[in-house]
């Protein structure tokens, strides 16, 4: 999009692709006029299907997950850096938002928690904060965490936990647990994205 004033980057989950999330841009265009949307594929193929992954989940445990996230940072940064360069937002990170789902949320929150990407806002669906310590998040980035109460893949307790940790580190965090919602981005969730980014992302 030429002359976009904001950039939203969708980050998909395991076994998915950017093309699966890009349609979410449709209902967000009214709330976020003048916004460009991008939805990259994660850099690694998912071995059990046709999609992609940010890091391997084969044999992943609570003990080794943080190490895998750390190892995935360079490739994540390359993918994000290319998008930001393409859209000419390198000097306008305060106008960039990450919207993650599941593993995409893990990587979005890691980008914040490590202090690597001081973007304008982050919306994180159905994921967890699993970054290696110590955490050094940029405190200027507001965060919205959204999780389905009926999530059968990653329990909503992970969002409750992430909220407490990030707030304890001085991050501006809002969280919403949506009753009856499983591991998905619901219509209500999309409305929350539009409202949050319209109010918090620089234009």
Regions found by a protein language model. Name each.
Residues 1-94:
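Serine-hydrolase catalytic machinery in alpha/beta-hydrolase-like enzymes
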Residues 12-14, 96-101, 148:
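Conserved alpha/beta-hydrolase "nucleophile elbow" surrounding the catalytic nucleophile
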Residues 157-203:
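C-terminal catalytic histidine-bearing segment of alpha/beta-hydrolase fold enzymes
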